[in-house]
Amino acid sequence: MTKICVKEIRKLDPEGEAPRFGAAYEAIELEVRPQDRPTNIEDILSCVRRKLHAIGPGDTLCGLTGTDLAQLEKTIRSTIAAQVNPDPSSFPEKLPHEEFVRWIARMPRAHPVEVFTTNYDILIETALEAERVAAFDGFVGCNRPFFSHDSLTRPESAPGTAWTRLWKIHGSINWRLDTVKGRQRVVRTDPHNEGEMILPSHYKYDESRKQPYSALLDRLTRVLERDDAILFVCGYSFSDDHINAIIFDALEAKRRPHVVALQYADPAEDSVLAERAARFLNLMALGPRAGHIGGRLGAWRLQEVRSAAQIEQAFQLDPAEEGEQPIGSGTLLLGDFARFAAFLGALTRPA
């Protein structure tokens, strides 16, 4: 994403002229460059927004005027939106989301299945419709559906347990801020590149405290307050403080809710996830090569090496030495959402 945004930023400079925007990007990148990792687009966008708030009339920062900085910020926003709003004709014939949705549809439940996502795209919505699974996202109305806070807080205002809940806690490419009779509200429209979204920047925590985002985060809090709550996490790296606070506070307040965090990469020893997984017995952090279970860290090893469709979807054995039998060590694949969805699909198919 960062490389794509940088490419679009450099296009702002007219050919044959001094590269003002390119030079400004390089100055900003140098200013915000972290010591322990490469600069990402969140670092850049945060800095651009700080400069937009600080610049005065007639001033320049990094060689850009206030108007230039606004154009730079808009370019980053629209580039991010375009990347999460691909042409549906470019979708693969089968999305992994369809296996995920199919599993949801076949799962018996006492409560509605509630899916929380930070993604802006509409891939899950596309899969829900392809599989004809009834879903509710907090929007009501027929012509121009609008976000209804009551539908999240009052059970009688929402559909029954057969309807899957989809909560997009960072917004969506098909949301828009609309003004009706002098009052602003968020409505659901066709996907577009100016969606109502919390973009990656240092302002995202403050933005999450506004409606409808605060209502959606409150919903996550209430779900985790249930004694029998189980939250499976896939594709989230525990880098958002506002979401982490809700999850970790719930685990600390009660011992019965459980969180299973499927990670694409093994959490670093000093990461917030590894630190909390060592403390909370009701938090499992499962990486490719090792997992925290019951507060203890250990490498993966199958107790019994055998072939089964479900195991093969979830775990890849390390190759054995020539002439030797596999010892059971290997890689857990479920931190990859496509693999996780395929695993769930294997559970729903006849043996």
Where in this protein do the model-derived segments appear?
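SIR2/sirtuin-family catalytic core signature
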Residues: 1, 8, 156, 218-351
